[in-house]
A protein has these predicted regions:
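Sec-dependent signal peptide recognition
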Residues: 2-9
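Hydrophobic h-region of N-terminal signal peptides that target proteins for export
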Residues: 9-18
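Generic hydrophobic/packing signal
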Residues: 13, 104, 166-168
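Acidic-aromatic substrate-binding/catalytic surfaces of carbohydrate-active enzymes
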Residues: 22-60, 75-147, 286-291
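A contiguous, surface-exposed recognition patch within enzymatic or periplasmic domains that forms
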Residues: 31-38, 42, 76-81, 85-103, ...
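Extended, loop-rich substrate-binding clefts of extracytoplasmic carbohydrate-active enzymes
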Residues: 44-72, 79, 129-187, 216
Length: 291
């Protein structure tokens, strides 16, 4: 073979190799605060509620004992990356995206915790903030802090996908989410599949609970086909882009310009919504600043 032709082939192959998507399962240590053992027998119902929703959790156990004991715990971490993005998924904690960064500037575009320290927020108690929490069919779903099924798939177009999912025991709904990274693309894609194998109609929601490092420059761009907004326990709905519902917060003393949230319409502005600072702001100023 002509040496010049071989050199040209190698030069052409080098950038193609750099664009390859890599996927692997590794063991990594993460500082973790342990939780106590649950009741041996699952609790049917004790009148417990969580964030405005009924706390029926049977047949799941209740993980509501937090401890101050911190250990270095080994986790199975599923990693997915190309030359632009690097994703870490924890199948042992609900299949959540634990970390995601832009490799071009080392910026974590999802909020990344430095350790695992649960709080009593989830349906079953223990819950972790940060990253991306997948919620089907309820908010802060039952298995958010539990191990779920996972598999890896290499696709014909060169992309690679990590699928996480389960059969939810309370409603028997089957769901899976495929997190994909593509060659030479700087985004992460999530595809959702939900199957109702039961003979009954089931109510459900899908909520990707995304945590980010928020500042005055951060913007969230909403799809143009948004028609209404809902609170996170499927009870209250409101119009879009100007919502007048109280979002179940009539007793919550959140003040905007001297008014409680119950007295003040909630602004859902079309196109772009910026993160509001913690300072009080009148509705007139909000409309002036964000329109």
């Amino acid at each position: 073979m002509n040496s010049k032709f071989l050199s040209a082939l190698l030069l052409c192959a080098t950038p193609l190799l750099a664009q390859e998507v890599h996927m692997k399962s590794v063991t990594e240590k993460i500082p973790t605060y342990q939780i106590g053992a649950p009741e041996i027998d699952p609790i049917f119902f004790t009148g417990r509620v969580y964030q405005g929703a009924e706390g029926y959790i049977y047949p799941y156990p209740l993980y509501d004992i937090l401890t101050e004991k911190k250990i270095e715990k080994d986790y199975n971490v599923l990693r997915l990356n190309n030359q632009y993005v690097d994703i870490a998924i924890l199948p042992e904690i609900g299949g959540r995206i634990f970390a995601a960064s832009d490799k071009t500037n080392d910026y974590p575009f999802f909020y990344t915790q430095t350790g695992i320290k649960p709080a009593l927020i989830g349906m079953l108690g223990a819950w972790l903030s940060g990253g991306v929490e997948w919620n089907i069919p309820d908010h802060h779903r039952a298995s958010s802090y539990m191990p779920i099924n996972w598999t890896m798939k290499e696709n014909e177009d060169g992309s690679k996908t990590i699928w996480v999912g389960e059969t939810e025991l309370r409603h028997r709904l089957k769901w899976s989410i495929g997190i994909s990274v593509y060659p030479n693309r700087s985004w992460v894609e999530a595809k959702i599949k939900v199957i109702n194998p039961t003979p009954m109609i089931q109510s459900m929601l899908y909520w990707a609970n995304v945590s980010v490092h928020c500042n005055d420059q951060y913007q969230v761009i909403f799809p143009p086909d948004v028609q209404f907004g809902a609170d996170h326990h499927k009870v209250y709905f409101t119009n879009w882009p100007i919502g007048e519902a109280n979002l179940a917060a009539e007793k919550m003393p959140i003040y905007l310009g001297g008014k409680t949230l119950r007295e003040t319409p909630v602004l859902f502005l079309p196109g772009v919504v910026k993160c509001l600072s913690s300072r009080a702001m009148t509705m007139e100023k909000m409309q002036e600043q964000y329109t």
